[in-house]
């Protein structure tokens, strides 16, 4: 009997309980890794490029749908679902949840003190995207293409050039905490 890629991902994530960070004085945030199974069996992942906004430390960056937990959210899973709906118009039903990954901090310490919890979802088909004004564009990238595109690139961070690990897809640079989250997901697929 064959199992679906989503069943395998769920089983692998279940075997490795996520590490949690409970750091006083930090914001809590959540992101959604939205996977879609393509014909031929490859998995694609949804990314968004944030709109350019003054005062937004992630302005113009490629990332995953998500954001800060709000008072009305019933936990971080609710945050991931709400933010994904707000930013992309994509609803994430309960049965689409495949699991949770380790909590992470951004490595750049001048950013707001935030702990990000990644949630992995699997959808049977590519949903229609209806981006909000928070999102400049979106991108679907196959995991195979992401693997092949991984490299070290030079970027400017807070006025300084530095080399970082990144995925480079169609001219979009995916680095930082997003690179680390996606790399962790790929660890479950090896």
Where are these regions (language model features)?
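N-terminal leader/linker segments that precede catalytic domains of diphosphate-processing enzymes
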Residues: 1-63, 68-127, 144, 156-190
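Acidic, glycine-rich loop-and-strand cores that form catalytic or ligand-binding grooves
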Residues: 131-139, 143-145
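A mid-sequence, solvent-exposed acidic-amphipathic segment
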Residues: 146-154
């Amino acid at each position: 009997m064959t199992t679906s890629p989503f069943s395998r991902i769920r089983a692998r994530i279940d075997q490795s309980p996520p590490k949690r960070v409970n750091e006083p004085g930090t914001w809590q945030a959540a992101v959604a890794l939205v996977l879609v199974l393509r014909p031929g069996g490859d998995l694609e992942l949804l990314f968004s490029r944030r709109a350019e906004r003054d005062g937004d430390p992630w302005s113009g960056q490629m990332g995953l749908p998500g954001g800060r937990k709000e008072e009305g959210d019933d936990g971080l899973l609710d945050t991931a679902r709400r933010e994904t709906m707000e930013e992309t118009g994509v609803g994430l039903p309960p049965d689409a949840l495949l699991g949770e990954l380790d909590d992470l901090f951004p490595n750049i310490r001048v950013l707001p003190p935030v702990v990000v919890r990644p949630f992995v979802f699997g959808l049977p088909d590519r949903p229609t995207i209806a981006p909000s004004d928070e999102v400049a564009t979106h991108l679907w990238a196959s995991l195979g293409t992401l693997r092949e595109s991984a490299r070290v690139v030079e970027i400017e961070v807070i006025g300084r050039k530095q080399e970082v690990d990144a995925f480079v897809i169609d001219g979009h640079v995916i680095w930082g905490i997003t690179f680390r989250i996606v790399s962790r997901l790929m660890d479950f697929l090896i």
